[in-house]
């Protein structure tokens, strides 16, 4: 089983790329994170596994997460895949989570999906409603994540054109499957 970690700043298009890959590749599935937060009205049915804090902590203490963190008082974690999993697994997580995954599974394919430039990232963030101040904060965070990802050996994919980026990510996955 191949484990693919996809990270990148908000607005880079990683979610869109991940969905396109999973929809077009029957050998690839998107990981479902566990969370202790409450279900929102707009949550997609299979996006998360909603659990109590006690359930989360029990799995955590048993070593049952590839990576996990806390955000705004709620826990989020990516479960260790089942041994019987016959499909490759795609994780859409931040670089800090990717660091945890690599500590356990150093052969994971780690991809950093990025906008072609900070100006383009700013444009995308503002267009989706983040506002100028929030966009600047996200760009500063993206620079930090970019540097961390590079230090961890992530492969960078610039999403200047969505279809081209999807083809590039698919080629990296195919090469990893072939053992290249």
Walk through the language-model features, giving the residues of each:
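Hydrophobic anchor at the beta1->P-loop junction of P-loop NTPases
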Residues: 6
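P-loop (Walker A) phosphate-binding loop of NTP-binding proteins
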Residues: 9
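The feature captures the helix immediately C-terminal to the Walker
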Residues: 18-19
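Post-Walker A helix-loop "phosphate-sensing" segment adjacent to the P-loop in P-loop NTPases
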Residues: 23-31
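ATP-dependent small-molecule kinase phosphotransfer cores
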Residues: 33-89, 96
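Conserved phosphate-donor/acceptor-positioning beta-strand/loop module used by diverse small-molecule
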Residues: 90-94, 104-127
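Small-molecule kinase domains that catalyze NTP-dependent phosphoryl transfer to phosphate-bearing small molecules
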Residues: 130-176
């Amino acid at each position: 089983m191949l484990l693919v970690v996809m990270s990148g700043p908000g607005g880079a298009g990683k979610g869109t790329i991940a969905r396109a890959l999973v929809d077009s590749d029957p050998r690839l599935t998107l990981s479902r994170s566990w969370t202790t937060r409450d279900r929102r009205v707009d949550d997609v049915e299979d996006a998360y596994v909603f659990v109590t804090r006690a359930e989360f902590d029990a799995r955590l203490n048993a070593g049952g997460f590839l990576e996990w963190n806390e955000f705004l008082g709620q826990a989020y974690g990516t479960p260790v895949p089942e041994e019987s999993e016959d499909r490759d697994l795609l994780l859409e997580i931040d670089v800090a989570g990717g660091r945890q995954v690599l500590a356990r599974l150093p052969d994971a394919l780690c991809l950093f999906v990025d906008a072609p430039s900070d100006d383009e990232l700013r444009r995308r963030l503002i267009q989706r409603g983040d506002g100028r101040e929030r966009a600047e904060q996200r760009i500063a965070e993206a620079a930090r994540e970019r540097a961390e990802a590079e230090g961890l050996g992530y492969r960078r994919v610039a999403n200047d054109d969505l279809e081209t980026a999807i083809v590039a990510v698919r080629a990296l996955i195919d090469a990893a499957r072939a053992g290249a």
